[in-house]
Amino acid sequence: MASFEQMRANVGKLLRGIDRYNPENLATLERYVETQAKENAYDLEANLAVLKLYQFNPAFFQTTVTAQVLLKALTNLPHTDFTLCKCMIDQAHQEDRPIRQILYLGDLLETCHFQSFWQALDENLDLIDGVTGFEDSVRKFICHVVGITYQHIDRWLLAEMLGDLSEPQLRVWMSKYGWIESENGKIFVCNQEENIKPKNIVEKIDFDSVSGIMASSQ
């Protein structure tokens, strides 16, 4: 199978041309989705084109490919890719087992039920077979949420939220985000007050602008 970069240029031409929604291109686009999953790469535009082709050609619908598209969208949280993809899947197919489970996982992530997410994922690890880097991509999203929510967080809680990480694994993520261990098992995330940057808005109004308004109001 060609690499992601090799396929990207060819797929880009397909998406720009009049054949964007030609069902004969589905096989190429589906292989591209599989390549994204294997190589931890991502192309939202191409993946949305796949889902649109499934809408236009229901007989060609592939549950496995759709599941991979959804999983790749989850790796790009907090962007709204997952919601976009979900809206393009009809209700009947949303009830298919892998798709239903992935939608549930997405709901847990979007509502920040992180411990429940890892528990549900552990019970359905087959869902992410062939999706390289999925768990670490989710951890990046969780760290993003922690970074904008907490000043201090219990060490045990952070480890749980990141999927019951071991001590060395947790230290890697703390180092990545510059989080420092403080006393009593707490981790210093950041000073939220320093993140609030008020803006002073100064608007200059010259006399000509005011005189025009005054004249029109008379």
Curated annotation (Swiss-Prot):
Keywords: Cytoplasm, Initiation factor, Nucleus, Protein biosynthesis. Residues 42-204 form the PCI domain. InterPro entries: ARM-type_fold, CSN8_PSD8_EIF3K, eIF3k, PCI_dom, Transl_init_fac_sub12_N_euk, WH-like_DNA-bd_sf, WH_DNA-bd_sf. The keyword Nucleus applies. Its main location: nucleus. GO terms for molecular function: ribosome binding; RNA binding; translation initiation factor activity. It comes from the Eukaryota. GO terms for cellular component: eukaryotic 43S preinitiation complex; eukaryotic 48S preinitiation complex; eukaryotic translation initiation factor 3 complex; nucleus. Gene3D superfamilies: ARM repeat, domain 1, Winged helix-like DNA-binding domain superfamily/Winged helix DNA-binding domain. Component of the eukaryotic translation initiation factor 3 (eIF-3) complex, which is involved in protein synthesis of a specialized repertoire of mRNAs and, together with other initiation factors, stimulates binding of mRNA and methionyl-tRNAi to the 40S ribosome. The eIF-3 complex specifically targets and initiates translation of a subset of mRNAs involved in cell proliferation. This is Eukaryotic translation initiation factor 3 subunit K.
